[in-house]
Amino acid sequence: MAKVDVVSRVTELAEQVLSSLGMELVELEYKHEGRELVLRLFIDKEGGVTLDDCESVSRDLSQILEVEDIITGHYRFEVSSPGLDRPLKKGSDYEKYAGRLVKIRTFEALADDAGNKRKTFLGELKGLKEGQVHIALKEGQSAVIPLDKIAKANLEFEF
């Protein structure tokens, strides 16, 4: 099965399992690390993910993956929380984490409200309105970034 098909099918199965457990899929990675093939899921739920949650998802989804036989050959399967630097992937993430410190990287340089062009924005996430992310920058400016211009966005840990 082609990599894109594996990712699509595993995502579908993972979302079914996670939904039944009151959790969500944050990100799915399927890639080679050295000579080893790795399938890695990052999961989350309201209040945070515990080790028991990761074990339950790993056990339940492993059984389904065995039966479905989607991935041929040996691979390592990991289930983890997204961590303190959780990626923001869906539009709802930008609403859910409003008020938090974020780092956003864009595909191309965009201007903040002072006209300064940049590809990296660090500041307080204000939310999502009409497909655009609003952020109050550390330097005092603000920026409005279209979702389709975001290459990567993560929560930042505040000390």
From Swiss-Prot:
Protein name per its UniProtKB record: Ribosome maturation factor RimP
Any single Gene Ontology cellular-component annotation: cytosol
| Subcellular compartments | Cytoplasm
What keywords does the record list, in alphabetical order? Answer: Cytoplasm, Ribosome biogenesis
Give all cystine bridges in this chain: none
Record function comment: Required for maturation of 30S ribosomal subunits.
Q: Which SUPFAM superfamilies match?
A: YhbC-like, C-terminal domain, YhbC-like, N-terminal domain
HAMAP family according to UniProt: RimP (MF_01077)
Q: Which family does it belong to?
A: Belongs to the RimP family.
Q: What is its main location?
A: cytoplasm
User: GO biological process: what's one of them?
Assistant: ribosomal small subunit assembly
Any single Pfam family the record assigns to this protein: DUF150_C
InterPro entries assigned: Ribosome_maturation_RimP, RimP_C, RimP_C_sf, RimP_N, RimP_N_sf
